[in-house]
Amino acid sequence: MTPRPESDEAAKEYYSFEEAVMGPIGFGGPHTYRDYLAALHKTALPLNVAAMIGTGTVKICVKGFADTPYTQQELDDARALIEDAMAAGAPGVSLGIMYLPECYSSTDEFAYILEPVGRYHRVITTHIRGEGDSMVQSVREVIEIARRVGCALEISHFKSCGMKNWGKDIHTAIADIEAARAAVSYTHLRAHETCADL
């Protein structure tokens, strides 16, 4: 789940982009993660929902599909949307770095806007920037983002694309992931708790 852009112009641009894949969708909907949860609670769902907030529509909310860097004000606005979602209970943030408009964002920009994720001890899940020739660099980028944010990381659909890349860089990327996991320190190496303690 992601917030709907506040301005009608940005919302129309977003819906136009989505309709190419999803077909016609209604104009409107929640503007914030909190609004989304409120609407969700009014619906009789047959299952539990734990919806993340997506950085793609966060970016569209603050700057549309522009291929320019964030301004400081846009960075602060994007971070505030993510902060609000974390405070409302979002389990994490979903990144689609290979997709428009996120592909225009830098590592530094992601680290800045995702700062609340670490503070709230949540997770980022991501489609990396490249799964072919740039797979190793892309894996290193998201590891660096998670390290700087101080949060858990899940790489979605981890694979090596393109026949020339099969069996080539995947082992390096796996080694990088394993090294990053080994570098994470967990403060509670031992514990003892019984039901009586509770």
List where the protein language model places each region.
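Divalent-metal coordination cores built from histidine and acidic residues
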Residues: 1-91, 190
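Short acidic, glycine/serine/threonine-rich loops at helix termini
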Residues: 2-12, 60-66, 107, 136-140, ...
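A very general structural signal that marks isolated residues within well-ordered alpha-helical segments
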Residues: 55, 195-197
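Functional cores that coordinate and move charged inorganic groups
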Residues: 83-185
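Conserved small/polar residues in nucleotide/adenosyl-binding loops
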Residues: 187, 191-194
